[in-house]
Amino acid sequence: MAERWTKMVGFLGAAANWTIPIASFMNLKNDPEKVDPIMTTTLAVYSAVFMRWAIAIYPPNYWLLGCHVANEVAQLTQLGRYGKWKVFDSKQESDKQ
């Protein structure tokens, strides 16, 4: 019973965690200036830590690992977009003024 309960809770946690990368992927169409670099960095670090945790526990939680891999990709993509905007696009906008 305890193992079944643990697996169910692990699955539900991973399922709920999918809302983070889904939201991030949906925001890829928004302006990069709206990206919060502190929160995005925090989410990237969070996912990196929990990717490791998801495979370190017994039994490994591959659902959670997949979720955090997707979130890591999403957050790093957002940070890349923000960095590109900050270095190139915002400088061009200030030069125009």
Curated annotation (Swiss-Prot):
GO terms for biological process: mitochondrial pyruvate transmembrane transport. Keywords: Membrane, Mitochondrion, Mitochondrion inner membrane, Transmembrane, Transmembrane helix, Transport. Belongs to the mitochondrial pyruvate carrier (MPC) (TC 2.A.105) family. It comes from the Eukaryota. May mediate the uptake of pyruvate into mitochondria. It is a multi-pass membrane protein. It comes from Dictyostelium discoideum. The chain crosses the membrane at residues 9-28, 38-55. The keyword Metal-binding does not apply. GO terms for molecular function: pyruvate transmembrane transporter activity. Coiled coil: none annotated. This is Probable mitochondrial pyruvate carrier 1. The lineage of its organism: Eukaryota, Amoebozoa, Evosea, Eumycetozoa, Dictyostelia. GO terms for cellular component: mitochondrial inner membrane. It is found in: Mitochondrion inner membrane. InterPro entries: MPC.
